[in-house]
Amino acid sequence: MKKITCGAKKKQPKIKTEMTGKGLTVHGGLLPVLNFMDKLYFFKAVETALHKQRGANAKYQFADAVQMIVIGVITGATAMTQVAAVWADDVLRRMAGYEKTPVDTSLGRIMKEASYRDVTAMEGLIHRFRTKVWKRAVRSGTYLKSAMSVMWLDVDSTVDGVFGKQEGAAKGYNPGKKGQESYHPLMGFVSETKEVLHSWFRTGSAYTSNGAVEFMKECLARIKKGVKVIVRADSGFFDGSLLDYLEATCSGYLIKVKLKNLNALLERQIWKAIDSKKLPGWEQAEFEYKCTTWSKSRKFIAVRQLIGIEQGLIELREYQSFCYVTTENLTPYAAHKKYGERATCETWIEECKTQMNAGHIRTSEFWANSALFQCAILAYNLLKWMALLTGGAVRQWEIKTMRLWLIRVAGKLTEGGRQLTLKLPRRFLHQEEWQLWERMSLTIF
């Protein structure tokens, strides 16, 4: 019998290892990130906004810790020890201009100096960076509806469970692990750019809509005058005081209804078929309704889908219903589809939590944890802004994809003629996207 050999696979060669390489890094893709942060005057902006000067003998300032944690989170760090491990990379330190970097305990000690004022300043920083990025995007020809006319703002909360005793953690709504202490952050996403407009780090006992009006006041203060904001949120934000505030500021809303008597209310409405051919079994209704605690009635829209018929003396039809309160001039079915786009908001929250590890790096103190949460939001937004300005396929990539194809690129730092050069592989996957990514990072704002 003739032996068939495969030409693709050859015998594995014997390879010895030597730990003698110099100037090597696995994070070559952080150079464009550092360049982008430099063009934003990131370090100076943090230093100026926080006005936080440590003692004269302190080697590292609060702004140093913020930058190191942001970079660490971008690489995928989920703990302070991992942030310190990332900065153990000699090449990264040289690229960022550091001779040495602090150990994890020193970073934690610096962050424990954070206060409510510092967290508020960090929230404001995100807004100032966004203003710069959006202006540059519009100048370069990117059409940003959110910067010019209408912004759909997706608001949601998320549960972040903790282990052990941590200040501010408390028992509250936690469907994943009932009874576990947690934090309950509140976040607002710009639907068009997928970035975080504003966020609060809250105790776990806070109800979903707790402080929603104050949160929206801070959100609207961060939006250009003349831009109409339409808030899209789940039933946790079905609150009369929030609707009153949004109407008073000429903002719109599309919010899922939460009522005890909702089914009975919907049964009393006049239902019309949407399209018997394209959408058989689907019906819609529109009506005015005033809740007990409201000062006035508002427009409700609803759709329902026939999911079963029970035959008997009386034919019983079973429906799956969806109901919303809104200010928008949309048909019930169009509003239902528009609300369905909000599902991506939950994806972004998950991306922010699991891929950017927002809320994962923690200390025992609440304001330190809140500042660390804002560092993760900064890291998330930085990559989203870089993707926005790079354009093309990169704009559609998730954080983990950017990290895999753009950040984790092997490199060797060499020096010659007083010039540092980062040498990358001659060929690697998504090389064209990486070159666009780097070119964008070198453009002055």
Regions found by a protein language model. Give the residues of each.
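Acidic, metal-coordinating catalytic cores used for nucleic-acid/nucleotide bond scission
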Residues: 231-239, 259-261
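Catalytic cores of alpha/beta
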Residues: 240-244
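Dynamic "connector" segments at or just before major functional cores
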Residues: 1-207, 213-224, 246-249, 393, ...
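An anionic, glycine-rich sequence signature occurring as long contiguous blocks
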Residues: 2-16, 252-356, 411, 441-445
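Short, solvent-exposed helix-loop connector elements
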Residues: 50-57, 332-339, 355-371, 387-398, ...
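Conserved nucleotidyltransferase catalytic core and NTase-mimicking acidic/glycine-rich helix/loop elements
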Residues: 73, 385-411
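Short amphipathic alpha-helical "interface-anchor" segments enriched in bulky aromatics
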Residues: 36, 83, 159, 277, ...
